[in-house]
Amino acid sequence: MKEVEIKGDTTVINANAFYTPEGAYLEELLKRVPGLEYEKQNKTMTYNGLPIHEINVNGESFFGGNSTLALENLPAKLVSKIKVYDKRSELEKITKVRKGGENYVLDLQTKREFNGTLITSAGIGIGNNDKKETELISNLFRQKGDNISVIARSGNRYKTSRYPDNRQDNVAMNFVKKFSKRFTLYGNMMYNHYASGNESTLYSEQYLTTGNRYQNSASTSTNRNTMGNGSLGMRWSLDDKTYFNIGGNFSKSKSDNTSDSQQSTSSEGDERINSITRNSDSKSDSHSFSVNADITRVFNDKGTSISLTGSYSDSKSTNESHSLSETTYYQLESSLGGDSVLYRNQYQHSPSTNRAYSVGINLTQPLAENLRLQLGYRYSANRQVSDRSTYESEVYQDSLSNYTQSRTYSHELSLYFNYNGKRWQVNTGVQMHPERRSLDQKTGLLYADTVRTSVNWNPQLNVSWHQGKTRFELNYDGSSRQPDLGSLVSLTDNSDPLHVTHGNPSLKAAYSQNFRLMGRNTRLGLSGDVNFSNTYNSQTQAVFYNLATGGTETYPVNVNGNWNMRASLRYQKRWKKRFNLSARTGASFAQSVALVNEGKSEEPDRSVTHNTSYNANLRLGYQPKWGGFDLQGDWRYRHATNQLRSTSNYTRSYNFSLNTYAELPLGFLVKSDAAYSFRNGTNIKKGEDDQVVWNLGASWRFLKKKQAELSLYWSDFLSDKKNYYRNVTATGLTESRTSQIGSYFIISFKYRLNKQL
C-alpha cells in the first residue's frame, strides 16, 4: 500500500510507512504524517486545513470523540491505517441523505496481529520539583468494531506553572459491543479531577486618538474542578427495513476558583487614571442530561423511508462568587478633595436552569438511481431561567441584581437533494426556521419584557468531483442569526463599574456566509484551499470611553463591512521510503468594523481594522530503521492597520526545531527535541524575544520480551522556556506571561503485557 491514497471521499494513510520510537503513543505517529497538524496547547487538530473533530477506532467512536484521550493513550504500534473522511450520523447513513455540516474524523484501523489482544501497561514515575505520575492503560480491539478501553492516570508530569499543588487525576472507560449484525451497544464513563494555579502578568496598550492608554496587571489564581460524565447508546435493526437508534449522556461538575489581582491604567506621560485591587473566589455546581432517539422505516428496495426523531435535555447550575475590590480614580476628586475611591464587598448567587425538547419527521424519496430528496419538519421548545442576586456588604442590592426568563418556540422546515455519482457528488438543501421568542427581565427596580417573531434561513451546497488521484470540492454555507434577547432589552448592567453594558431594541438579524474551494492531487503531492466569508448586519459593541475613570460603556449595534479571506497551498513528497518533505504556505486578510467614541462627539466613529498575515512552513524528515530525524522551520508575519487612528502594528516570528531519536542495542533508546523561537515587532523588548526549549529522554527496555521499561525524561534542560501570549491589532496590543518552573526531570518504570483472548 502507498503512503497516501484517495478512495472516493476518503483519504487512506498507511501508518506502517511512518516509523515511531518503541512504546510511542498515537500523538507521536500523527506528528510524522504529512498534512496532519496538532496544536497541543488548545487541543485542535487539522488535516490539510480541515478541522478534525474526533478520533474513531475501526469505525466506532472512541470516548465520545475525546481526541486527547486517544492521542495520549493509544499505542502507535496498534495502527495499520488511518482513514480521514466526513462522518455521517446514523440517521444519515440509513437514509443516505447528507444534511449539511462537517464532521471530519480520523478513523484508526488496528493491525490484524493485535485483533483480540488485550494490551496493558502500568507505570509509575517520580522526579524533582515534586513531579510524579502513575498510570494504567488497557485496550482490547477487534477489527469488526468491538472494543473496550480502560485508562487511569494521576500526576503532574506536564504541568509547568509554579503552583505547587498542580495535579490531574483521570479514570475513563469506553466500550463497543456488537451482539449481532442487528444490535450494537456502546458507551463511556469518565472521571476527572484537577487542581491548577498560575502566577501571571498582563500588559496592554490601547491606541486612542485622544492619547494612548496603558494597563499593567499581575494576578495569582487557583482552580479546582471535579467532573464526571458518561454516555450510553444503542443501534438496533429490528428487521431489514426498520432501524432504531437511541443515545443519552449525563454530566456533573463542581469547581472552586480563587484570584488575587492588581491592575493599573495610565495615559501617555505616565499620568495615572485608575488602579484596582481585587480579591475574588467563586464556586459552581452543575449537572445535565440529554437523550436523543430516532426510528426509520424503509418501505421498498429503492429506499423510500420515513423517520421520526426526538430529543430532550435538562441542565441546572448554581454559581456563587465573592469579590472584594478597591478602585481608585485619580482623575476624579472626592468630596474630601482627594482621589475618588470606590470600595465594593460584593457577593452574587446565580442559579440557572435550561430545559429543551424537540420532535421531528423526515420523508426520504429516491427520484432516480443516484438522486434522493428529503423533506423534514421539526418542532422544538426551550425555556431558560437565570436569577442573579447581588449583595453589597451583606445587603441585597436591587440595582446590581438581575432576573431573566426566556422561552423559544421554533419550527424547522427542510428540503434536501443528494446526488451520488461515480465522479460527482452534489448535496444541497435549505432550512427555514420560523420562531417565537419571549423574554422577561428585571434589572434592579426596572422591568422589561419583549416578544419577537422571526424567520431564520440556512442554505447549504456541497459539490465534489474526483477522478483517480484528483479531488475538488466546493462548499457554501449560509445562515441568518437573530440577536440575543437580552441584547434587545433597554436595561443597564453596572455590576462592574468599569465595564457598564446597555441593551438595544433596534438590533437586526445578521446573515453570515462562507465559501470554500478545495483541491488535492496525491500523485503530485499538492493540495490547497481558498476560503471567503462575510457577515451582513454583524453585531458588535459600540464602545464609549470615559477618559476620567478609564472605564467603558457599551451597547450592541449592527454594522456592515466585516469580511475575511484566506488561501493556503501544501506540498508533500516522500522518496526511498526514508525521506519526507512537506511544505506549506498561506496568507489571509480580514476587515473588521467597530464603533468607538472617545468623548469627542455624541455619536461613535466607525473604526475599520485591516489584518494581513502570511505564513510558511518547511519540514524535512529522515527515517532509517534505527531512528528518525525531523527538521522543521516555521515563519509567521502579521500586520494590522486602523484607518480611524492611523496606527500600524506588526509581529514577526520564527521557529526552528529538530526532533531525533535512535534505537540502540540491548533495548536502549535516546531521543531529543529542541526548538529555537525568535520574534520581533511592535514593542517587543530585548530578553523577551527568543527562547530555546530542549527536552531530552532515554529509556531501557529489558526482560525476555522487553516488557519492562526504565526511562528518564528531562524537560526544558536549559530552563529557558518563556510562556508568552501576544495579540496585536490596530486598536492595541496585549501580552501575557505565566511563570514557569523551568527545568525538571522524572524517572519512570513501566511494565507492558499483551494477552490473546
Mark where each language-model region is.
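Outer-membrane beta-barrel translocator domains and adjoining extracellular loop/strand segments
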Residues: 95-96, 161-164, 197-213, 257-274, ...
